[in-house]
Amino acid sequence: MQLTGSQVIIECLKEQGVDTVFGYPGGAILNVYDELYKHPEIKHVLTSHEQGASHAADGYARSTGKVGVCMATSGPGATNLVTGIATAYMDSIPMVAITCNVGVSLLGKDSFQEIDIAGITTPITKYSFIVKDVTKLADTIRRAFSIARKGRPGPVLVDITKDVTANKVDYVKQEPVFTQPDCSAFTEEDLDKALHMIEKAKKPYIFVGGGAILSGASETLKAFVEKVDAPVCDTLMGKGAYDGTSANYTGMLGMHGTKTSNLGVSECDLLIAIGVRFSDRVFGNPKKFAKQAKILQIDIDPVEINKNIIVNHSIIGDVAIVLGKLNEKLEQQKHTEWLSHIADYQKMYPMTIPKEGLSGPFMIAKIYEMAKDAIMVTEVGQHQMWAAQYFKYSKPRTLLTSGGLGTMGYGLGAAIGAQTANPDKQVINIAGDGCFRMNMNELATASRQKLPLIEVIVNNHVLGMVRQWQTLFYKQHYSATVLDDGVDYVKIAEAMGAAARRVTTQEEFNAAFQEALESKTPFVIDAIVDSDDKVWPMVAPGAPINECFDGKDFESKNK
């Protein structure tokens, strides 16, 4: 049957099982929005800004594992998606961004709102398409979804000229193609070599990243950990891949990782890296990282092998499949003495919570106590690290955070996406006051959609993480980090249709958070904390991770 390009776009979205689109209309994409109006089976969430739409699509994808979809018009509409696309790219999140451009006859003529968005996004997508021929439209959209899902996931952009959305073409419905993970990159010899390394190790440590979540490998990973009988640490992106309440779990590795994980990895004789990219935030000084260990790396992307850290052996493949193969062959290991040594570290270096005063660690721990099944979302900064340190993530896809790009302003849009996709779950966004300012306009979106998400602002009136570095490494030169300008976040929240409370004590926070849990609309808690609160432990930039220090260490050193 013959359909217009706009109709083809909607039919292709339906083919792919898309039930929600986040976006903002405009002239070039108006034909598509007119067609979308006729299809209530696809929910459209109108955000307050296109960046919010891209973050919402990201949050939808992270919390479900499905492809998130966002749309924007030409020119500034398209460029406003860029930060969200880059955020998804850095964290390997499947997303399809659909933009519309000026007509073919107007391309290259500096036309109104013309922009080469495909060119702009080429470095931050798995692929960027521009469609100038309606006969190629359907297959391009199908390819976009396939590319976004296949192998290491990521965002794909499809830019469509306006005339293509109006032209007619024959359309034949197709079922979506879901390709199975490719196992051809590794051999039995690869598995056998890995098994030999594991069986020979006396002090193995398992290091888990976001790739384990993207692969859906949590159950296979659990069985692998039990067979290897080893302690487990993770990255920020790997939170929830392995049960954070397990006795084997020692917390995050790296700059703000636990002392146990940092010291343990520095002492281990085998580091099994699963779905990690060895970020600079993890290894500290690469020349001194895990120097006593042989390293076995398992990852679906060959580009990650030996990119930042040289490894002794690698297996390239889907994490769940590789671990499953290893589990079939691996005999039960026993490392009682090693695990006891690591347990001693955990007793020596616990993650402590200030007993008095309102603080980030206290609030995160209380949130865990009152809402341990929530989907946690964060912005970027000190509060992000506290959310990683003090909430025990027992399931995958329950911490949504910008790890690679470190995008301030990510959280509220992502929370909207997650809450839209998971209406029966509690979604909580942890923000700093600096981050909240970035995209607080999306609170109006949450109110309009009647989303019962909770926004906790850890309000220290400064850019906390930057101030921490200025305190520790820049002689307390607080350049451009003070935000004490009287902005009333409670009034802003109420003006946007949300309930809001300001709290200054532990008791006030407990009461406000209970009220927030019972709310049917967005609820903002403006929590006032000390400007000089710091994230501990910490590894200084460029230092080896075994030189991690906490507040007491820092005070002793600088007496």
Where on the chain are the PLM-derived regions?
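Glycine-rich phosphate/pyrophosphate-binding beta-alpha loops
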Residues: 26-29, 75, 92, 155, ...
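Generic enzyme active-site microenvironment
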Residues: 157, 297, 377, 430-431
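Basic phosphate/pyrophosphate-binding loop/patch that engages nucleotide-derived ligands
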Residues: 150, 371-372, 447-452
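Active-site diphosphate/adenylate-binding microenvironment
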Residues: 6-10, 14, 18-19, 32-36, ...
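Thiamine diphosphate
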Residues: 107, 112-113, 305-308, 314-316, ...
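Phosphate/pyrophosphate-binding active-site segments
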Residues: 135, 173, 196, 292-380, ...
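Active-site nucleophile and cofactor-binding loops and adjacent substrate-binding regions
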Residues: 24-26, 45-55, 70-77, 132-133, ...
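N-terminal alpha/beta PP-like core and its mobile active-site loop of ThDP/TPP-dependent enzymes
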Residues: 1-330, 366, 452-457, 473-475, ...
